A protein has these predicted regions:
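Contiguous, well-folded functional domains in the mature portion of proteins
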Residues: 1-269
Length: 269
């Protein structure tokens, strides 16, 4: 249904319910996208066409410094200090943790679905003791993923999982509490939801790795890679996109990478 013209009912600039209306667009700069403003739906053919829209390259200039790592997607950081978002990026992550507990510890074996010997060996060698950064995409964000570093894709695979999960230690609660608990459940979702794992060997001769884990959330989100194993990507190249609904992603960094996070990041309400 979300691929059909029927789904365009609310993809209009009309108030009060149009996704393209001024009130709905206060967080979106439409000049960044390819649009046909003469069309009643601005050129979109379906809701999913709107959701997966491409962006103009000049709208997201890529940091060219060789020692920089960039965000994979338009997103809000999950691990910056506030009551809702919890703690800072997780360092020295463990191979296995009781991730359903309130501390929301990350378990890299579960994140990577490390059942195959090849994957488990990669996780043991590079990611146990490494660093995890997780972020969330809001519905109005740009929903394509891009390479955080330049390098060669050595693994790309999908893990089947669950949709619309909550950490059982949080509960549901009312509307505001329910949203807050859903955000608090996001670390757990990185280990139990449907997700796409892409592992990149950094092009610096060190052999170090960066993994991108794209996480499908809610009941209809899906992960669609556009790259293959063995492919070389430049920092900022497209890797894939989300369809239909809510999403999050995690960057997992090699234990031998020395990282400095930029605290000057805008966190929307």
């Amino acid at each position: 249904m979300l691929e059909s013209p029927v789904s365009l009912k609310y993809i209009t600039p009309e108030e009060p319910n149009g996704w393209l209306s001024p009130s709905a667009s206060k967080n979106t700069d439409w000049s960044e996208y390819y649009l046909n403003l003469e069309d009643p739906h601005w050129g979109f053919k379906s809701f999913n066409d709107f959701f997966t829209r491409a962006i103009r390259p000049e709208a997201r200039p890529i940091d060219s410094r060789s020692n920089s790592i960039v965000h994979s997607s338009d997103s809000s950081p999950l691990h910056f200090s506030s009551e809702i978002y919890g703690k800072n990026p997780s360092f020295n992550v463990q191979p296995e943790s009781q991730f359903w507990l309130k501390d929301n510890e990350y378990s890299v074996y579960d994140m990577f679905g490390a059942e195959e010997r090849e994957v488990k060996d990669l996780v043991d060698e590079h990611f146990v003791g490494g660093t995890i950064y997780q972020a969330i995409l809001c519905p109005w964000y740009y929903h394509r993923w891009h390479a955080p570093v330049s390098g060669t894709i050595i693994k790309s695979y999908r893990i089947g999982g669950k949709y619309f999960m909550l950490n059982p230690s949080c509960g549901l609660g009312g509307l505001h509490e329910g949203i807050e608990n859903y955000v608090k459940s996001l670390p757990m979702l990185s280990m139990v939801s449907v997700r796409q794992v892409i592992i990149i060997r950094i092009d610096d001769g060190s052999g170090r790795l960066v993994a991108l884990i794209e996480i499908g959330m809610t009941e209809v989100s899906s992960c669609c890679p556009t790259v293959e194993e063995g492919q070389y990507v430049n920092k900022g190249d497209q890797l894939g996109y989300f369809q239909y609904g809510g999403s999050s992603y995690a960057l997992v960094f090699d234990k031998d990478l020395e990282l400095e996070f930029n605290p000057n990041i805008y966190i929307p309400n």
